[in-house]
């Protein structure tokens, strides 16, 4: 039974808490709530990932996924899976502020390249495909194609938002980026 541990970046509370699909992002963090809605697995947010993992294990989880956890070396691991943006790669290979890396590259057991051609030797390929929009107030899902030809206000709070904006444009939306 899998469980997810996360720091819960952006949440207002700093107390450890469990997150589910009904959780408020202010309490659990944006990403943990989205993960909960998508997976329905137990999620624990805590600045101390070891404590969060112990909590989930006590709840019956036998596989722990640490969201954005490669830099948290205090959490023991059996397998490291690194997901990277194949368009940007590792940039110049340097650490911030001279480059894009938050920490030195370390060996990973599995590398997965988002947008990577499938013929690469050192990594698996994956491709994200946007198909639906989620209405933040009502929770309603709509096919992205329902907005073809319309002008949309697109807001992104991610490190490389251009891929998101480009994907919307590829679906025929006129995008005003924010």
Predicted regions mapped to residue ranges:
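Walker A/P-loop phosphate-binding motif and the immediately C-terminal alpha-helix
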Residues: 1-7
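Phosphate/Mg2+-binding loops and adjacent switch elements
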Residues: 8-122, 132
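C-terminal accessory "lid"/substrate-recognition subdomains
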Residues: 90-178
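Short hydrophobic segments within beta-strands
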Residues: 5, 83, 154-155
């Amino acid at each position: 039974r899998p469980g997810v541990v996360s720091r819960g970046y952006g949440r207002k509370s700093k107390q450890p808490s469990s997150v589910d699909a009904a959780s408020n992002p202010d309490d659990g963090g944006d990403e943990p709530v989205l993960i909960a809605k998508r997976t329905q697995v137990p999620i624990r947010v805590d600045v101390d990932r070891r404590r969060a993992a112990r909590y989930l294990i006590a709840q019956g989880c036998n596989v722990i996924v640490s969201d954005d956890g490669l830099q948290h070396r205090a959490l023991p691991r059996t397998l490291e899976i690194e997901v990277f943006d194949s368009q940007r790669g590792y940039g110049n290979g340097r650490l911030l502020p001279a480059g894009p890396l938050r920490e030195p590259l370390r060996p990973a057991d599995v590398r997965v390249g988002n947008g990577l051609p499938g013929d690469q030797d050192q990594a698996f390929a994956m491709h994200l495909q946007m198909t639906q929009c989620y209405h933040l107030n009502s929770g309603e899902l709509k096919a992205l194609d329902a907005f073809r030809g319309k002008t949309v206000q697109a807001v992104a709070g991610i490190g490389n938002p251009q891929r998101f904006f480009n994907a919307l444009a590829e679906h025929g939306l006129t995008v005003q980026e924010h």
